[in-house]
Amino acid sequence: MDAARPGHRAPPATARELTTVARLRSVPRVAASLALAGVIGFAVAAHADDGPTADDLRAALAPGATLRVDGQPLRTEILRDFYTSVDFEPVWGPDPDGAARTALALDALTGSRDHGLTPAHYGVPALRRRAELPTAAMALERELLLTDALLRYAVDVRAGRLRPTAVQPDWGIPPPDREDPVHELAQVVVAGTLGAWLEALPPPHEGYARLVTALHALHAAADRVGPSARGAVDQKVRQVSVNLERWRWLPRRFEPRHLVVNAADATLTVIEDGRVRLESRVVVGDELHPTPVVRSEVGAIVFNPPWTVPTSIVVDEFLPKLRANPRFLADNDIAILDRRDDPYGLTVNWAAVSPDHFPFRLQQRPGGWNPLGRMRFATPNRFDVYLHDTPLPELFQREDRALSHGCVRVERARDLALLVLAGQPAGRPEALDRALASSTTGVVSVVRPLPVYLLYWTALVDDEGRLQLRDDPYDRDARVAVGLARNPGTTPRPAGGPATVSHQPAGAGTHR
């Protein structure tokens, strides 16, 4: 493997890869026999250099089998599905094509650390030990372990090791498909395109590739520094690894024209055809009201919007103020909807109002200190968060801008409106300014809805190639880091004696 190559992505095969199933069948055969010893073990005959045979694999993957290698559980049903697709012929055999495929697979698994993954989670130490102990039994174990590991790696590097909602409940973007690519792997083995397939597995985004390069450099630095500096480098490694995982949870393609808010550094960027069209500082949710991760679209802009107060704010903030000052609503021009005879609740006994069953809807009229400012960008989503203007522009001068109840306040709201409405009559500067100067609420539909991604990056690489680390205002990184570090199964123990592939009849034991 070329250690100087960032990402350690598997290169195209240097030896010809297998091109037909018939070529797979040309791998030399080795006799196999079954031996019963508590569990049914597979004692593969001599001639280890020949590798396992199709008969060995059929026996190992017989219905009802439960396979473990050095205590590492293998996914028998998935392996059986894969080997059925290739007529149970070995894939990682000692022939030139099998050796070339093995090199590609091991290069990808070893290079997984530059994607923020852990090679040991894919059995790399166990695989290398088996290469050093070339017995027939070891060859069979290596065949099965490598296939299982490569299928797991393919899912992890393409769609993420973790399910996003398991570590961040307010993740609202559907994650990529996590189905094992059993038939994909079989097809590329037969077609001789394993190297190209491995290259195409990670997310194709430039932001992801930049972080891979940065992580490669951090690993190199960690190998050079002394123990006193190692902790700081390791922390950066963890932070970059967490953000690579977040990239893997995202769609593999963004629309050519889209808007991204990074809640971790409170910035907004509009990108069109690969170019930055607009950048703006924003205010995002505070620690108690974090801005969620979600995709939506700007489908309309509301000028001079009223503010319907969310129930959580009414109960947690307004009700205590009303109990202390019954004129609070009148003083702030907030009315109770559908209560014309007493719009400010001056006759309400607020002390008797239960926070669990608040009976009123409150709305602040447009203008003045309305917290939505002069415009709201309608972005329907299940979290009911949106982008809007603000009457407090001084907040954008603060370094810490995690201050809102979850919605996103945009410093350059007028410029964003002009961009969103470009090509529409309402998007002409003079028309927009007239709408803003009016005290009347108006709604303009957007002809070309703008996709909006509210995301969360605490590590990114800028256009000059510099790694930029951000604070973690919502303390989200730690849970992702813990999940990534967790071993998906039992770590294979060192090979100290004859290792076996064990086969347990159905019902003899379970593994969850």
Where do the model's predicted regions map?
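Bacterial N-terminal signal peptides
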Residues: 31-42
